[in-house]
Amino acid sequence: MEGDDALEAIFRHVDDDDQPWQEVKRQRNADGTTSSVREKWFAFRGDPPYLSLLGRYDPGMIVRRHGHRSPHVVFVIEGSIWCGERVCPAGTHIELPEGAAFGPFRAGPEGVTMFEVMMGDPRSWGDRPELVDALRA
């Protein structure tokens, strides 16, 4: 393509001010403290749909078992997180096929930072696979 219609690479940096951190989940812990999930969305496109983000979970944060309406890749950058019964330290790559569920997630004592990419519709559907089947019908 030529001129104004040419496609170009898009560059973002974790410290860019135009990409704010967003609190997307919060829980009250048994000891009265709160834990949160914060996300910084680097790309959120609709055609074709995809989402890439950096996520930070406070220590002890729990996210229910769920799945997404698209393939989902997670890479643990710092800290650790439990995914179900499996501990995932820094360096762990998790691949979730469309229609599969994972979790529950529980952030480790130091919290966790993860890079995530959802290659399609990023909305989640809980841990009931029949909901995904109904969406596909």
Report the location of each language-model feature.
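A short, N-terminal "cap"/entry segment at the start of jelly-roll beta-barrel domains
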Residues: 1-47, 130-137
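Conserved short histidine dyad/triad with adjacent acidic residue
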Residues: 35-67, 87, 97-101, 135
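Residues that flank catalytic or metal-binding motifs in active/ligand-binding sites
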Residues: 38, 72, 110
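A short secondary-structure junction signal
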Residues: 53, 126-128
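Preference for bulky hydrophobic residues occupying beta-strand positions
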Residues: 55, 75, 94, 116-117
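Glycine- and acidic-residue-biased ligand/ion/polar-headgroup-sensing regions
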Residues: 59, 68-83
